[in-house]
A protein has these predicted regions:
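Short, low-complexity N-terminal intrinsically disordered segments enriched in polar/charged residues
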Residues: 1-36
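A solvent-exposed, acidic/Ser-Thr-rich amphipathic alpha-helical stretch
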Residues: 27-83
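Acidic surface patches and DE-rich sequence motifs
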Residues: 42, 95, 113
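Hydrophobic beta-strand positions
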Residues: 77, 93, 109-110
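Structural motif
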Residues: 82-86, 107
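Generic short beta-strand segments
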Residues: 88-94
Length: 114
C-alpha cells in the first residue's frame, strides 16, 4: 500500500470508531478519536473542543434528546496526504423506531498526530 492509501484507511477506521463510540454513548472512547484541540463549525457556531468537552448528558437534551443512533450515508475522500485526509460525509440520525431525525452533510479533516 502507498502512504496515501494507508492514510485513507486509517482515516476511515477513525471515522468508524468515532461513530461506534458515539452510538454507544461512550464519551471516553468518542473523545479518543479526536486530536485536540479540535475545531467544529456547525449551525453558524465555531467551537474549539478540548478534552472533556463532551459530557454524557449531551445525549439527554437538545438535538440528541430523541436520538437513538447515527449512520454514515456517504464518505468520499476529497483530499488525502500522508498525514491528513479530508472526507466529504453525510450522516443520518435515527430514532429508536428507525424514523429519521435528519441527515447532515459535513467535511471531516482527519489528521495523524501521533
Amino acid at each position: 500500500m502507498s502512504e496515501r492509501s494507508d492514510a485513507i484507511a486509517a482515516a476511515q477506521k477513525c471515522l468508524d470508531e468515532f461513530m461506534a463510540a458515539f452510538n454507544a454513548r461512550d464519551v471516553r472512547s468518542f473523545e479518543r478519536t479526536f486530536n485536540f484541540p479540535s475545531v467544529r463549525l456547525a449551525s453558524n457556531t465555531l467551537a474549539i473542543i478540548e478534552p472533556g468537552y463532551h459530557k454524557p448528558e449531551m445525549f439527554e437534551t437538545g438535538a440528541l434528546a430523541d436520538w437513538h443512533h447515527s449512520a454514515w450515508e456517504r464518505r468520499e475522500v476529497i483530499h488525502a496526504g500522508a498525514d491528513k485526509v479530508h472526507i466529504d460525509t453525510r450522516f443520518t440520525r435515527y430514532r429508536a423506531d428507525g424514523s429519521v431525525i435528519g441527515s447532515f452533510d459535513s467535511i471531516y479533516v482527519v489528521t495523524c498526530e501521533n
